[in-house]
Amino acid sequence: MQERYLRNIPALTEEECQLQQQKRVLVVGCGGLGGNLISILLRFGVGHLRIVDGDVFETTNLNRQLFSSIPALGHNKARIAAQRAGNINPDVALDVVEEFLTEENAQTLLQNCDIALDALDNIPGRRLLAAACEKAGIPLVYGAISGWVSQAALSMPGDRLIETLYPEDTVVRDKSVLSFTPARCASMQASLCVKYLTGRPVETGTIYYFDLLNQEFETIPMV
């Protein structure tokens, strides 16, 4: 057991730590949610991360996106995340894809992955990723944030969770996000991911909803 992972034990067993080092995780989006997810999973020590984002950092990202900084403005988010990743855990293998998720590349991005993490900020992309995971038979960890609130869930093939949550005509009007909201949501997403990868019991098709303004938490079965 490498020294860097010793504080994961006994919360995780040594066998679980070794198991997750064999896993391949896709993270789509390297902004508010994605930056936190990538950092968490690097520190956990998953074996392989494929990180995807075609966007560049802008000034409006500085309030919440972990890998944003003044020097990073104008640079691709996935590329900057990869640079930071090497300083966090160089033992994790990285695939860096400086592209947006599209119908044309979705199945290629999912190839050989054990699970996909939704760190997107738009509904069409979220629906596209969910449909691709359904087709590939790969579980999806969903996360969404707005203002003070966030929600996360593990969706297995056949759940159709994203279709239920986001019909085609769904419109998001509030695009404000506070700095702590993506960190909270990403923590829940990462915990669902790690439990799935290590074979621990985990609820699927259940929304975990957090309201940090009113300190409220709800568990909402959806399937």
Predicted regions and their residues:
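N-terminal charged helix/coil linker that caps or initiates catalytic domains
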Residues: M1-L26, A144, T164-L165
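Glycine-rich phosphate/adenylate-binding loop
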Residues: Q2, L109-I115, A119-V223
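Conserved N-terminal Rossmann-fold NAD(P)-binding element of oxidoreductases
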Residues: V27-G29, V52
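Hydrophobic residues within alpha-helices
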Residues: L37-I38, A81
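Glycine-rich phosphate-binding loop and adjoining beta1-alpha1-beta2 segment
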Residues: V46, I51-I88
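A structured beta-alpha segment of the ubiquitous adenosine-cofactor-binding alpha/beta core
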Residues: G74-I115, L120-R126
